[in-house]
């Protein structure tokens, strides 16, 4: 059963078709959400929200892009908006923690390369991180990224270049320490 037939069946109210469509695309949506958040609970929440929105808006799907690309575009929006909310909450949480802190906290151990890389990716601006994860981690083409995120292919390429440059800069100190 192809996606077009599934869409027609979902529009006709077939719950089995909804489940099949969900099963066909859920892994890719979850992987993107997890790679962007690093948090299983948030990734599951964003995956669920993505499919709620996709099913609510299925009537608007025109078939100009592949269904999977359309769903990934929704996922990208859901994740980026969700991360903005989480970031605002965590910023307030840190400010509160700092206002309650007394004295000097013990020094944390130096992170290893994996932790450094994860932190460097987390520190990227949201759009750079999304393009980096979609291209270098998930294997999307720039055309698919452009379609999913509503940007020209050249913008996707430029953002990937900038993301990689920031990661190189962020990891250069670690590389110098390790080499000496």
Protein language model regions, located:
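Helix-turn-helix DNA-binding module
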Residues: 44, 122, 126-130, 134, ...
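Amphipathic, Lys/Arg- and hydrophobic-enriched alpha-helical face
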Residues: 22-40, 57, 121, 173
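Arg/Lys-rich amphipathic alpha helix in sigma70-family domain 2
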Residues: 56-63, 73-94, 110, 173
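Structural recognition of an alpha-helix C-terminal capping motif at a helix-to-coil junction
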Residues: 31, 45-52, 56, 65-77
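Internal acidic/polar
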Residues: 1-3, 81, 89-114, 141
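C-terminal edge and immediately downstream basic/flexible tail or linker adjoining helix-turn-helix-like DNA-binding
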Residues: 9, 91, 114-120, 133, ...
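A short, charge-rich alpha-helical start-of-domain segment used by transcription regulators
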Residues: 7-31
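DNA-recognition helix of helix-turn-helix
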Residues: 80, 84, 128, 137, ...
């Amino acid at each position: 059963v192809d996606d077009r037939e599934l869409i027609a069946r979902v529009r006709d109210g077939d719950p089995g078709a909804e489940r099949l469509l969900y099963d066909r695309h859920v892994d890719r949506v979850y992987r993107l959400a997890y790679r962007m958040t690093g948090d299983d609970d948030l990734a599951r929440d964003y995956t669920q929200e993505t499919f709620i929105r996709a099913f609510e808006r299925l009537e608007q799907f025109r078939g100009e892009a592949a269904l999977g690309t359309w769903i990934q575009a929704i996922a990208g929006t859901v994740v980026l908006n969700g991360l903005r909310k989480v970031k605002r909450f965590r910023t307030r949480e840190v400010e509160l923690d700092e206002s309650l802190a007394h004295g000097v906290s013990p020094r944390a151990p130096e992170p290893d390369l994996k932790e450094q890389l994860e932190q460097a990716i987390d520190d990227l601006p949201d759009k750079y991180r999304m393009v980096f994860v979609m291209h270098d981690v998930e294997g999307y083409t720039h055309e698919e990224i452009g379609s999913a995120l509503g940007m020209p292919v050249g913008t996707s390429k430029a953002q990937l270049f900038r993301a990689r440059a920031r990661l190189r800069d962020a990891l250069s100190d670690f590389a110098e320490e390790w080499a000496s």
